[in-house]
């Protein structure tokens, strides 16, 4: 670290963001839109908001984060809506708490559009530079940054969003080089500065699969994965709802030849060869990890996904590896449909430095240095959506600190963003953290459809929701409220023609009369059925219809979940049997079984604070204890 007397500042900003990935862009845009002069520093102006791994946004829990960032006034949801190649709603056959929108995006278009947005944002300056040092004031508060080439910038707040670049090193087999990702140099020096300031740092690992030329693939032997015909949107802003031509993805599978190749050459992998001991992401394992951890599985699904409309590269999802390049081609050619493929880019593993986020407050400001914030992979997370969520929070709080306003803490009961940050700041997590629906005990309350209802008023309060968006929001909420009231108040008599038609269609009787809201509570009856019988409002938007139906149909489940939450709170001091066999409790996640068996907590409360043990696991554990109590002989 450097004192302000030892440097000459080239320029002055209120907030400086270090790194222009998905966390950095959200942080910089939030800060600038809230009126702070902001500098966004990046190692490469041509790789702003680059998607170095899978060019996709959304999926379970990640889509909820994306909707929430948009509801606050962020950009990632709009970006996915502007640049999608394919959209699909996952888990639609299940309850709305786990519905998950996923978009395959055009990698180059995504980066180009975001570059235009940040370059044209008022109050925001974008330039290249590698930050290696922090400039601190007399009270150990941040007052500036210094770059590798000795240029210094004064500021009141710094947000570190360094991704995989901090001490980054990529591996292919036993060959390695310093790099944040292929073709881009690593950020050196900043880790040493942070260590000198007393921060604990660690190493994590991730990886990306090879890219294949689509002209060399035989799609006729693969299973097509078509898009949904009815397009859905991440953003609550209709201004970005522009339908585009969609593309297919495809599915192939590993073969016995694939598995044999990997098993015979495990010793050549950076991890199994012993050259890398950093922890990788549990929920996005390399193909060699899958073969080892799931040795009983004869085959694994592999998804073949386009990286863009006008580029020939295919992303081979589920096939990341650190094995040698020559072996990678043999592995790829063992997959049906890729027997004659041309590999354009090899897969690689990347290890990098991170700061365990227990060193941050829930505002994402560090505890050691006033005015220093961290967001994204530097906090130990994995995924663009997790990064974007932290980025907008750090940007909001950095701006509020500059403006001498109270910084915000997002309660876990009110958003997935709050759940994410609470987990990061309170649990000692030593592997890359991915958001899962099971990590939230409030997931029935924290649905994608009501993200605007939960967070847009806050976005308006902090200055990220403009008058147009606010008008759209208030009109939508008024429409939903009015329609719910109409459905509760309107009764249908059993002799009405519409009632008789409904009985004939559904096979369920109507005795005397029934409210339209009670009709909607029936499991197989939906708002579209009301419309079919002339009982709905045709002018309602799909999002309004779905919100009305969900809030009426699942009201009882929501109340039950709230009671479960209260039960967990009461059960904190409940003792756990010393001889409990966690491996046999199938309702626990695999991660929870492993962590509980290793730590062997004494109480339910202690179990709930183990990293990787989610609230849903605690509910499963309580249910198991109740079952044990019922089956035990009465003494």
Curated annotation (Swiss-Prot):
Name of encoding gene: mnmG
GO CC terms in record: cytoplasm
Subcellular location: Cytoplasm
Function noted in UniProt: NAD-binding protein involved in the addition of a carboxymethylaminomethyl (cmnm) group at the wobble position (U34) of certain tRNAs, forming tRNA-cmnm(5)s(2)U34.
Similarity field: Belongs to the MnmG family.
PANTHER family: GLUCOSE INHIBITED DIVISION PROTEIN A (PTHR11806), PROTEIN MTO1 HOMOLOG, MITOCHONDRIAL (PTHR11806:SF0)
GO molecular function: flavin adenine dinucleotide binding
A Gene Ontology BP annotation from the UniProt entry: tRNA methylation
Name of the protein this chain belongs to: tRNA uridine 5-carboxymethylaminomethyl modification enzyme MnmG
Signal peptide annotation: none
Cofactor(s) the protein requires to work: FAD
């Amino acid at each position: 670290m450097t004192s302000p007397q030892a440097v000459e500042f080239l320029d002055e900003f209120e907030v400086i963001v270090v790194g222009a990935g998905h966390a950095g862009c959200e942080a910089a845009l939030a800060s600038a839109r809230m009126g702070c002069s902001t500098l966004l520093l990046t190692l490469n102006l041509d790789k702003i908001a680059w998607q170095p791994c899978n060019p996709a946004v959304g999926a379970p829990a990640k889509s909820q984060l994306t909707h929430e960032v948009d509801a606050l006034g962020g950009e990632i949801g709009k970006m996915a809506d502007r640049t999608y190649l394919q959209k699909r709603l996952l888990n639609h056959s299940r309850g709305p708490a786990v519905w998950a929108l996923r978009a395959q995006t055009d990698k180059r278009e995504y980066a180009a559009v975001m570059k235009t947005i940040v370059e044209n944002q008022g109050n925001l300056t974008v330039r290249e530079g590698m930050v290696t040092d922090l400039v601190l004031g007399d009270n150990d508060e941040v007052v500036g940054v210094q770059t590798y080439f000795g240029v210094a910038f004064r500021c009141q707040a710094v947000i570190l969003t360094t991704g995989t670049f901090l001490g980054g090193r990529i591996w292919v087999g036993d060959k390695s080089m310093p790099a944040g990702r292929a073709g881009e140099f690593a950020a050196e020096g900043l880790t040493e500065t942070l260590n000198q300031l007393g921060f604990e740092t660690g190493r994590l690992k991730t990886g990306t699969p090879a890219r294949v030329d689509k002209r060399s693939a035989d799609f006729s032997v693969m299973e097509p994965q078509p898009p949904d015909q009815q397009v859905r949107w991440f953003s609550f802003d209709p201004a970005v709802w522009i339908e585009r031509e969609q593309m297919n993805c495809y599915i192939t599978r590993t073969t016995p030849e694939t598995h044999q190749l990997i098993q015979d050459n495990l010793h050549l992998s950076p991890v199994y060869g012993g050259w890398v001991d950093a922890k990788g992401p549990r929920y996005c394992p390399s193909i060699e990890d899958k073969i080892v951890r799931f040795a009983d599985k004869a085959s694994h699904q592999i998804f073949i996904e386009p990286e863009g409309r006008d580029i020939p590269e295919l992303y081979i999802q589920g096939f990341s590896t650190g094995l040698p390049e020559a072996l990678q081609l043999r592995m790829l050619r063992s997959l049906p449909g890729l027997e004659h493929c041309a590999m354009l880019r090899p897969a690689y593993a990347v290890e990098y430095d991170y700061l365990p986020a227990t060193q941050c407050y829930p505002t994402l400001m560090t505890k050691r240095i006033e005015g220093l914030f961290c967001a994204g992979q530097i906090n130990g997370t994995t995924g663009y959506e997790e990064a974007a969520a932290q980025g907008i929070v750090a940007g909001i709080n950095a701006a509020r600190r500059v403006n001498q306003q109270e910084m915000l803490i997002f309660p876990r009961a009110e958003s997935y963003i709050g759940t994410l940050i609470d987990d990061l700041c309170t649990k000692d997590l030593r592997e890359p953290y991915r958001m899962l629906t099971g990590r939230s005990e409030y997931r029935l309350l924290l649905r994608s459809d009501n993200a605007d209802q939960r967070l847009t008023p806050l976005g308006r309060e902090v200055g990220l929701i403009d008058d147009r968006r606010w008008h759209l929001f208030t009109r939508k909420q008024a429409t939903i409220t009015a329609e719910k009231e109409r459905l509760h108040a309107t009764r249908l008599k059993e002799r009405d023609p519409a009632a008789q038609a409904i009985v004939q269609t559904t096979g369920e009787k109507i005795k005397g009369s029934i409210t339209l809201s009670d009709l909607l509570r029936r499991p197989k009856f939906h708002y579209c059925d009301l419309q079919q019988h002339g009982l709905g409002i045709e002018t309602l938007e799909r999002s309004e219809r779905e919100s009305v139906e969900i809030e009426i149909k699942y009201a009882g489940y929501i109340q039950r979940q709230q009671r479960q939450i209260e039960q967990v709170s009461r059960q904190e001091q409940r003792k756990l049997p010393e001889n409990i066999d966690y491996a046999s409790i199938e309702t626990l996640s695999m991660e929870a079984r492993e962590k509980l068996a290793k730590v062997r907590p004494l109480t339910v409360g202690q179990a709930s604070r183990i990293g990787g043990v989610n609230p849903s696991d605690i509910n499963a554990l309580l249910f198991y204890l109740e079952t044990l109590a019922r089956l035990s002989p009465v003494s």
